[in-house]
Amino acid sequence: MEMKKSGLGTTAIHAGTLKNLYGTLAMPIYQTSTFIFDSAEQGGRRFALEEAGYIYTRLGNPTTTVLENKIAALEEGEAGIAMSSGMGAISSTLWTVLKAGDHVVTDKTLYGCTFALMNHGLTRFGVEVTFVDTSNLEEVKNAMKKNTRVVYLETPANPNLKIVDLEALSKIAHTNPNTLVIVDNTFATPYMQKPLKLGVDIVVHSATKYLNGHGDVIAGLVVTRQELADQIRFVGLKDMTGAVLGPQEAYYIIRGLKTFEIRMERHCKNARTIVDFLNKHPKVEKVYYPGLETHPGYEIAKKQMKDFGAMISFELKGGFEAGKTLLNNLKLCSLAVSLGDTETLIQHPASMTHSPYTKEEREVAGITDGLVRLSVGLENVEDIIADLEQGLEKI
């Protein structure tokens, strides 16, 4: 079903649906490991890719196909691939496009496990990795080499919400025709930002977050052009990682996407109100949010994003000790990692999600010991603020 001319909410609900034998409104969960062939000849044709059809759920499943079609439509890309986690999506993609002797340019500020993969994983297998500030385009330009195969980044970045000009960066990266630009779009989602429309080659997601939105699934997604998607599916996913998403989990995300647009509207609206509260609070030292005019990436965010998101990071006067006091005294906000859930989540990046960094690496990346990260949920905003207020009073 072609939905590219429809609104985002309509696309999230209707795109990629498959007709099934019984005409069910909800997508069936095809809970099977393998699929029966009509004949030996048909099995041979499918393995030879001469005939479309399912073989084995690691290679594809009807429930998962619907999810893949939906994310491709939402990102306005040619093809999607579902994986068992965000790290599965990132790893499968990188193991497909990289080989020993290749070079990667990436940002100093990344999700902790992505940083560990770049800093300790890829380098074990002969891939050179250079860390730069990708918001500084001169640094990107100076880091590029003849063997640069990938430029990888997040925008907004986790956890300090740094913004990168995707269109300008893609133009620099593509001066080398062999370089692929890969962007983690988890924080922005296709509700706010569509990197493929700005020159990016591959988009990755932790679908655990806003796309599912209910905190009950671990999943990853990749969107790119068809040729690359086929390579990632049949090399990175099939042979290198085996990070296959089960049909049950795919179903949960398909269901979550039915409310995707209205959830994102509420997330962002709540966040704007909370930013205003935090920015005026006497115990808050600094607020990091791309919707603030004082944010260094504000103009770029305004240009390439529809809204500014629902992730807020802030530093308290009193540093980490003040942060611990706040975290330990909240009653409504949940002290938990992850993000994009219906519940408001709060955590301490330096000791939690970004603990793979050394203290020195965190300082270079702008992840201070006093930084607190807030994922704004869907509760009534006055209740979230009241909880933050009473927690801040304890400092």
Curated annotation (Swiss-Prot):
**InterPro entries per the record?**
Cys/Met-Metab_PyrdxlP-dep_enz (IPR000277), Cys_met_metab_PP (IPR054542), L-Met_gamma_lys (IPR006237), PyrdxlP-dep_Trfase (IPR015424), PyrdxlP-dep_Trfase_major (IPR015421), PyrdxlP-dep_Trfase_small (IPR015422)
PROSITE patterns attached here?
CYS_MET_METAB_PP (PS00868)
Which terms are listed as keywords in the entry?
Answer: Lyase, Pyridoxal phosphate
Q: Which reaction does it catalyse?
A: L-methionine + H2O = methanethiol + 2-oxobutanoate + NH4(+); L-homocysteine + H2O = 2-oxobutanoate + hydrogen sulfide + NH4(+) + H(+); L-cysteine + H2O = hydrogen sulfide + pyruvate + NH4(+) + H(+)
Q: Does the keyword Lyase apply?
A: yes
Query: What is the species listed in this Swiss-Prot or TrEMBL entry?
Result: Fusobacterium nucleatum subsp. nucleatum (strain ATCC 25586 / DSM 15643 / BCRC 10681 / CIP 101130 / JCM 8532 / KCTC 2640 / LMG 13131 / VPI 4355)
Q: This chain belongs to which protein, by name?
A: L-methionine gamma-lyase
Give a GO molecular function annotation for the protein: homocysteine desulfhydrase activity
